[in-house]
Each structure stands twice: as structure tokens, then as C-alpha cells.
Curated annotation (Swiss-Prot):
Domain of life: Bacteria
Protein name: tRNA (guanine-N(7)-)-methyltransferase
EC number: 2.1.1.33
SUPFAM superfamilies: S-adenosyl-L-methionine-dependent methyltransferases (SSF53335)
Residue ranges with Basic and acidic residues bias: 13-26
Gene: trmB
Pathway(s) the chain acts in: tRNA modification; N(7)-methylguanine-tRNA biosynthesis
Amino acid sequence: MRLKNKPWANELVEEHPESALDRPDPAEKIDWEARFGNDKPIEIEVGSGKGQFITTLAKQHPDRNFVAMEIQKTAAGIILKKKLDEGLDNLQILCADAANLVAYFGENSTSKIYLNFSDPWPKSRHEKRRLTYKDFLAKYQAVLTGDGLIEFKTDNSGLFAYSVKSMNNYGMHFDFMSVDLHHESEEIVEKNVETEYEHKFASKGQPIYCLHAGFLAK
């Protein structure tokens, strides 16, 4: 969902190049170790929206590094404000297209990728835009370490069914799957970190579909 343009958010991104990259040239390698100041494992959320999910994770896990990858500059600015307000040194913002994922991160550089409530692109002619289309899966496989995982959540049953089929056809393995995440065991529900969108629709009784999947050994 496209957010209304907020000039202050756009300006904030431009004012803080140390914390947010605005559409960097894919031909120029990003030195993530230098940007974070350490070599801790990196986890990426592709399509971070307003950032509730990724900022919560960053607070919960100071021993990990997180990248919020968001194509909308206004959304990136909103996430950046949360990062700065909360002093989250283990969070970087990348305002860029996920199509360039491999160029931005390199191979075997990432331990986990989060796909939360991605655009379902329901029309058949837009299949290649879905973030669980086979071409995107190939990009995730390239940047993930051998034991790295994709964690995927959606409220769209059609996208979930498509994603299960796409990942299965790609030869991936599933470590966890739920067609009603918020009614799983208490332990699973307590560990779940909600997005803004998820909280809104789950509170209305909308089932949340979820899966965790990995790739076979490279």
C-alpha cells in the first residue's frame, strides 16, 4: 500500500546517509560491515512498510544486524525516524528495489529474509512481480547462507497458496506452516512479532498465513 508523500520523511532520509541508503547504484558494493561497525549476522525485511516489525526485532535482538528494505522513500523515512528515536544502531534502512537484492548484499551474506504482507499482485500477468515468484526465490537463495531461512506472512490466501506451490516447485523445504498463526500454540503466538497491518486485520478475525522455508544445500 502506497503511503501519502511526507516531505519531512524524504528529507530525513537525505539528511542521514550514515543510517539510510537512498537508491544506491547496484554496481557499487555496499560495505555492510563498515556501516554496522561489526560483522554480526544480517537479517533483511523486504518491504518494511512503516517499520513496526523490523524495529521491534532490532530492539529484541541487539546481537543481530537488520536491514529494512523499502522501495517507498516516505516509508523509509518513517522507519528511519523510529531508528533514530530509539537509538537502534543495529538497524540500517535501504530505500531500493528488491530486484537488485543480490547486488546490494552479495552471496551468502544474510541469515534470514522476512516477507511480510507483500503485494499479492493477483492478476496473472503480474506474476513475476510477486516476491515469491521463482526469480525472487533465486535471489534469496543467492544471498542467504546455507542454513538461512525465509519467513513469510500474509493475510491473502491466494498469495499463500501460490507461495507454497512456488517454493515447493523450487525444491525448498518447509520448517513451519500455519493457516491461522494467531491461533497456534501460546508459545508460537508469543514469539510472533506483528506488523502494523497484521495487528489491524488479525484483531478483526482475519486469519494470518505463515511459513518458514529454506533451501537445499548449495
